[in-house]
């Protein structure tokens, strides 16, 4: 069993001291049977290899393909194929504020069609669940640069009664200073990174949103919450503990 100290401080254990407890799995999030299997990973790897600079020799491409095949579980095959962590869970502290509830807004036909497409996709991915909540926010459909529709949640009223998290974000100058003398740089991108962060079960009902059919709430962190950036930075600091500003930014 691998053990990770995420506290940032040394920890000491006595011989024979229990380190963990095992419990049966009671809930699985996002475990959707995939029809893609190995073929799905193969297609993703082929696409990545095809994007390599033409000046890279075939031997290097082959070794890269072997490396990617070795770590296929960390590759995303499609928009709903993503990870999930509860190392850090997002909290929404509203103290004793009354639940905020917006009246259902009228949506245009194209917007309603976009919502009808989005909701089932989020349900299948395990990102949302049906909600019976006193909180309610509306969906706002906006156009992306490519002309397609994106569904966002109007959390302005919720944010107004949420206690702000002042967790510090990295300073740009410190990040630039840490790269002094470095020659090679790599970047890693997460598929829908916020959606890979769990929302604490006690706070899920506060993310409830309404549409022309039902109300739903998020199981994972959506965009639009005022403290989402702080939560994600806290998660990255835990995951990269001991590496940040040394070999990782």
Can you say where each PLM-predicted feature lies in the sequence?
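Retroelement reverse transcriptase polymerase core
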Residues: 4-16, 25-249
């Amino acid at each position: 069993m691998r053990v990770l100290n995420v506290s940032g401080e040394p920890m000491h254990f006595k011989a024979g001291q229990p380190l963990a407890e095992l419990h049966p799995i009671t809930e699985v999030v996002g475990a959707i049977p995939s029809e893609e299997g190995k073929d799905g990973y193969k297609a993703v790897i082929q696409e990545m290899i095809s994007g390599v600079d033409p000046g890279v020799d075939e031997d290097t491409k082959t070794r890269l393909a072997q490396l990617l095949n070795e770590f296929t579980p960390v590759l995303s095959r499609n928009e709903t194929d993503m990870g999930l962590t509860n190392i850090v869970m997002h909290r929404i502290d509203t103290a004793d504020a009354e639940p905020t509830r917006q009246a259902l807004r009228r949506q245009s036909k194209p917007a309603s069609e976009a919502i009808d497409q989005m909701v089932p996709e989020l349900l299948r991915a395990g990102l949302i669940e049906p909600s019976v909540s006193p909180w309610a926010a509306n969906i706002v459909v906006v156009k992306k640069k490519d002309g397609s529709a994106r569904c966002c949640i109007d959390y302005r009223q919720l944010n107004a009664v949420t206690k702000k998290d002042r967790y510090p974000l990295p300073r740009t100058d410190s990040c630039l200073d840490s790269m002094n003398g470095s020659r090679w740089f790599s970047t890693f991108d997460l598929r829908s990174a916020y959606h890979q962060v769990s929302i604490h079960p006690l706070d899920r009902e506060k993310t409830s949103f309404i549409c022309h059919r039902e109300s739903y709430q998020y199981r994972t962190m959506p965009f639009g919450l005022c403290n989402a950036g702080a939560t994600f930075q806290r998660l990255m600091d835990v995951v990269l503990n001991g590496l940040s500003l040394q070999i990782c930014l």
